[in-house]
């Protein structure tokens, strides 16, 4: 889909701050509010804008720490559908946050969230590994997030260590 300059500008504004209201977007883009609304409605209808979401730092919420894992998956593609069929089966699991087709040693990269490492292990052994097309998996646990989707989680400004000088 070919976009106009203003449509692209509005997408860039929303990509940076999905909470921006119509008036703010109109001022930033230099167009009337009703035109912004028309453009956004069109982009939503065409599924260019898929969703608006918040980015949560779950480590700061008691009882919601959880575990995130990236799983590299080797699969045997099926004739006529390639990797799409197995990717769809994988992304339908509730635990799965993202699925990517990759170049390199592994075919798919799967990001999942669980309450514990045991939950992730059960997902891999009971659900993922048992799929017909899956040949092998390698699981990597996320130990700490520094930056995600362009947003920095920790700046290091609150370093509480004591300064030691000679």
Swiss-Prot record:
Gene3D superfamilies in UniProt: 3.30.70.920, Winged helix-like DNA-binding domain superfamily/Winged helix DNA-binding domain
Molecular function terms from GO: sequence-specific DNA binding
A Pfam family: AsnC_trans_reg
SMART domains assigned: HTH_ASNC (SM00344)
DNA-binding region: 22-41
Keywords: DNA-binding, Transcription, Transcription regulation
SUPFAM superfamilies: Dimeric alpha+beta barrel, Winged helix' DNA-binding domain
Name of protein: Uncharacterized HTH-type transcriptional regulator YugG
Name of the gene: yugG
